[in-house]
C-alpha cells in the first residue's frame, strides 16, 4: 500500500512513524509551506494508492480535486469542517471512496456502537457529553464530541445545548448537554454520562497517545483502498475490525 500523507504536523509525523513500523510504504508527504517536503498535491509524481489527510479545512478543495482527478481513495481525518464542506466531501464520494471521521480510533468506533445499543434503553436518563483536550486545541466542542452527539440524536429526540450560563431554568429531559475542557497535554478524553434518579452510567474513552489515531487512519486506508466509490466512516472501521477478529478466532 503506497500512502501519501497530506499535512505534516504532529499527526502527520506520527502517521509516518507508525506506517514505517507497520511496513507501509509512504511514497509522498505534502506539507504546504514546507521546504523539506512537497508543497502541493499537484506536484506529487510518486505512485499513490491512498491519501491520509491530517491537514486543515482550507486545503479541502485541492484534496478532493486530487482524489477525483487521479481516482485515489481519501482518508480525511481533519477536523473543523463546516456543514457545506461536509456536503462537498459527500458529493466527491460519488466518484471515489472517501473515509471521513473526526476520530479514527477503534475505541471511539466501539463507543459509537455501544451508544447505538444503549441510548434507546435510557429514556428516563439525562445525557451529557464531556470532552477534554490539550490547551492548544482551538475548536470546541471537539469533532468527536459532535460525532457522539449525532449518534445519540439518531436514537433519541434530543437537542444539543452548548452553554447554560445565560439560562435560568431547570434542565429539560430532551436536552443533550455538551461540555468542553481545555488544559495541559490531554490527548483526548470523551465521556457520555447518563444521569438517572439515584444512579449514573458512564461510557468513557481515553486516548493515551496520538498513535491510536494513526493506527486507525492506516486501518481505514486499508479498509477503503479496494472499495467502490462511497462515503465510509467509523462504522465501517468497526465492521472491518470485527470481521478480522472473527477470522482469527
PLM segments and residue spans:
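Rossmann-fold dehydrogenase core element
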Residues: 73, 88-105, 119-128
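Short glycine-/small-residue-rich Rossmann-like dinucleotide-binding loops
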Residues: 55-56, 79, 180-182
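Short acidic/histidine-rich motifs immediately flanking catalytic phosphotransfer sites
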Residues: 44-52, 68-74
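Short hydrophobic/aromatic-enriched beta-strand-loop microsegments
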Residues: 26-28, 71-78, 97-100
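C-terminal substrate-binding/catalytic lobe of Rossmann-fold NAD(P)-dependent oxidoreductases
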Residues: 2-5, 10-45, 123-249
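Short, acidic/turn-prone active-site loops that include or flank metal/cofactor-
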Residues: 32-35, 79-82, 103-104
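Rossmann-fold NAD(P)-binding glycine/threonine-rich loop
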Residues: 58, 64-65, 78-98, 109, ...
Amino acid at each position: 500500500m503506497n500512502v501519501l500523507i497530506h499535512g505534516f504536523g504532529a499527526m502527520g509525523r506520527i502517521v509516518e512513524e507508525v506506517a514505517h513500523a507497520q511496513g507501509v510504504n509512504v511514497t509522498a508527504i505534502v506539507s504546504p509551506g514546507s521546504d523539506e517536503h512537497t508543497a502541493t498535491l499537484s506536484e506529487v509524481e510518486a505512485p499513490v494508492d491512498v491519501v491520509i489527510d491530517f491537514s486543515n479545512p482550507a486545503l479541502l478543495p485541492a484534496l478532493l480535486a486530487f482524489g477525483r482527478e487521479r481516482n485515489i481513495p481519501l482518508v480525511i481525518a481533519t477536523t473543523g469542517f463546516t456543514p457545506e464542506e461536509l456536503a462537498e466531501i459527500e458529493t466527491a464520494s460519488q466518484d471515489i471512496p472517501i473515509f471521513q471521521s473526526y476520530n479514527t480510533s477503534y475505541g471511539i468506533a466501539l463507543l459509537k456502537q455501544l451508544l447505538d445499543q444503549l441510548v434507546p434503553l435510557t429514556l428516563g436518563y439525562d445525557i451529557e457529553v464531556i470532552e477534554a483536550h490539550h490547551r492548544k486545541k482551538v475548536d470546541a466542542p471537539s469533532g468527536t464530541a459532535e460525532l457522539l452527539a449525532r449518534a445519540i440524536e439518531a436514537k433519541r429526540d434530543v437537542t444539543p445545548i452548548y452553554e447554560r450560563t445565560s439560562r435560568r431554568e431547570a434542565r429539560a429531559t430532551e436536552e443533550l448537554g455538551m461540555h468542553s475542557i481545555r488544559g495541559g497535554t490531554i490527548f483526548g478524553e470523551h465521556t457520555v454520562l447518563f444521569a438517572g434518579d439515584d444512579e449514573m452510567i458512564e461510557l468513557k474513552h481515553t486516548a493515551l497517545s496520538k498513535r491510536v489515531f494513526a493506527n486507525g487512519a492506516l486501518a481505514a486506508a486499508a479498509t477503503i483502498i479496494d472499495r467502490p466509490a462511497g462515503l465510509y466512516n467509523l462504522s465501517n472501521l468497526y465492521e472491518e475490525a470485527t470481521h478480522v477478529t472473527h477470522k482469527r478466532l
